[in-house]
Amino acid sequence: MHCPFCSATDTKVIDSRLVADGHQVRRRRECVQCHERFTTFEGAELVMPRVVKQDGSRQPFDEEKLRGGMLRAVEKRPVSMDQIEQALTKIKSTLRATGEREVKSEMIGNLMMDHLVNLDKVAYIRFASVYRAFEDVSEFGDAIAKLQK
């Protein structure tokens, strides 16, 4: 690794530690030439699968779109940002674990509902009503009845 101070190519690692729940390595380095010290972080480059929409079009996975949908569903509900971020992390891990290069948007929506039903039932109904395009009150009633079982 090049020294950020003198651009020398020879540096040595003084200390290595796992950070971010073991997903990154923090390394303390020292330049052999100028003896300045600096820190680097290493992490795996994780590629998310592409999303196949219902109309057949394909687009890159958009974490912000996923986060926005969840935030709208839990708006004014007693759900913390930590809970939201944990759910998003689990959804992304599940998608990566499929090993597929492409996943259907339907799978993402179902994963979102699986997590919302455990976080907050009202948020689940909100999301499901939009995602499943409820057209009348009876569809809301059916969804609520399933939750009460």
UniProtKB/Swiss-Prot annotation:
Domain ATP-cone: 49-139
Pfam families the UniProt entry points to: ATP-cone, Zn_ribbon_NrdR
Zinc finger region(s), unnamed: 3-34
GO MF, any single term: ATP binding
Note describing how the cofactor binds: Binds 1 zinc ion.
Cofactor entry: Zn(2+)
GO biological process: negative regulation of DNA-templated transcription
Function of the molecule: Negatively regulates transcription of bacterial ribonucleotide reductase nrd genes and operons by binding to NrdR-boxes.
Family of the protein in this entry: Belongs to the NrdR family.
Matches recorded under NCBIfam families: transcriptional regulator NrdR
Name of the protein: Transcriptional repressor NrdR
Originating species: Shewanella halifaxensis (strain HAW-EB4)
